């Protein structure tokens, strides 16, 4: 039986991969690792199988200055791994980001493969010197020369996948993903009013017919037609805790990067009291945790994890 199987962002979580901060700046490691350990403990307490990634190989190439730490994919595995149905995809990361090529990661992918999961890897970009222009305006930094996209550019809603065309994924990446997945799925390339990454900072599907939206990055014009009938919870203004250490590598909206454990239960940064209140007022229970250095390390609870298996089957959610 395939150990991989994910069809939506909200089906009950069964197995997840959690990143590691080891290898980041020393002053951040202990606190962040303790918080990630706490996340793992809470998830295990909810009956979820938890896997941990090893630290990134220090020989990996450095990331561009505005793309985060060199250890990006060990801490943020959702940048590089995407599960759609029973297929695990290694995505063609934006040039300059390291790839998940450690022996331990390969062994994990082999375990999923030998269980019956489909494992595919997108062609890694080769035009790295000209693909990414950090001096271009936000949303125009990726050129359309070959497919590139981070995995968290994609949100799964049954037979429909939202793909944010942005500085984390170009339109060719959406075309490659559609070709790789075939006719069972429809990939919707979306452009928002805010061109910077990532898709999971803009929209959070909470359950059938219910989404959390970032008011700065999503408006009615940029939502695919099939989502316009869904109830939208507008994310309130978030508390910006700022980076206690290190440079900023994510926006002040990182607090909306929440993890859905199952319909009606989400993991939220405990510092976001207004967001928790809004969710609870809409019938969503909240498990409050914290990633103190989230902005410095460019993350949130969704981005530091990869859901590998959720209970559910492939369905259409076009109401």
Swiss-Prot record:
One of its GO terms (molecular function) is scyllo-inosamine-4-phosphate amidinotransferase activity. GO terms for biological process: streptomycin biosynthetic process. This is Putative inosamine-phosphate amidinotransferase 2. Keywords: Antibiotic biosynthesis, Streptomycin biosynthesis, Transferase. Pathway: Antibiotic biosynthesis; streptomycin biosynthesis. The gene is strB2. Belongs to the amidinotransferase family. The keyword Transferase applies. It is an enzyme of class 2 (transferase). It comes from the Bacteria.
